[in-house]
């Protein structure tokens, strides 16, 4: 079978520094799925961007190599030819939908733009194709979403829009850079099965870039492993998982989340007691229009959390997980009762609530976006102390150093800035910022979703160690059920703002009662039997 894509001895340097991609060669045939795996910084995304010449060539050089698409070297192709290839013959699902979508254009305009450019579709024809694509990727009530802007969609919905745009012109090659990172397990399964169906219908080849080895095992036909810009191993999926030959590959395969946490004795009085929490958001007609109705995001949710325990909150995108976390911090208006150590917090105004903020901290999903690029690490970690502990400034530096040591970071690096750290290190900085105030409760909102498996495992072990040392309580919000299982003592399953199932995490993972919970667990790939014959080509 002829090769659709052949990368031959490709190297990429940035500003003549160390090679980001170092003499790699790989090929992809029509209808095949090749998974490109490796830790953050291994060169996976740089390789993908090189195929479509999307790197800034003032900073990136191509000293050697070829990228042959149907025998044509794209590295030598003129810009006019590249415009024909991009989006029509080769499409790409980018890793970060929050920054890949234009914030000034609505969803309809962004999808229709590629249809008009490559297929000449306009007006009702383009609109109908746009609706068809949104239905394909599982956007509910797509007619109401055509006029929405990116900021009005959840992370998972934005990712689905990106996938719809990539599939709009039925490309011969789809480059999928972490296509399911922001998606919950049921939508992950839907999207991957959609790609599988389209591949079978169109004979489309897929270059799948991911850090999720369970997805690789199930859907890729071949795997290429990258480390520090080099290709260290290539093999059929079943062969690589059964008998990896390179030490780095063995390290990746062994980086599974740890087992369930140790049991914690139940206390007489819960640290947190939430009763009938309710959140509604006003919806307006137009940018400056009047409020027409309210969207009911969280509906009469009740739960308790003991000191030293972790409550995992799971559910699909838009189920209300993050909204609950924001309501507990009074970042979102709510009704109902919220008690911390028996003190009613829901009726407090912002001024009265301020002393309680140091006792409830949050670690956000995106460590790069939540850390100020203009502040050093010491300034970031110290900021909370300057607000909540201004009378003891002499001890601030000591506390910053102690917090950085607690999360496994070198205090000598505290004068550096966020961009100088890896994704895993930035997440440790975010945890240190929360930890320095010695809180009772930390809300962890998707803290591991942007991290590869080896770094995920390190962060999980760090969180468990800190919890054991300080008796902290966590609310852990995630769509990754393997990580939730590793951390949670209790589990709360949400659907459309309503509790579906709530109780002991171990019991729910072993024997879920509700059908929706069963569907979630079935869709989570770690529940599938680890059999080499599971691999399904997409």
Walk through the language-model features, giving the residues of each:
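Conserved ABC ATPase "signature" region
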Residues: 73, 125-144, 395-412, 522
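ABC ATPase NBD coupling module
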Residues: 74-91, 109, 117, 239-244, ...
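ABC ATPase "signature
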Residues: 231-235, 243, 502-503, 511
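Conserved ABC ATPase signature
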Residues: 148-153, 157, 417-421, 425
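Conserved ABC transporter NBD signature motif
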Residues: 61-73, 336-345
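A short, proline-enriched helix->beta-strand linker immediately N-terminal to the Walker B motif
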Residues: 168-172, 436-440
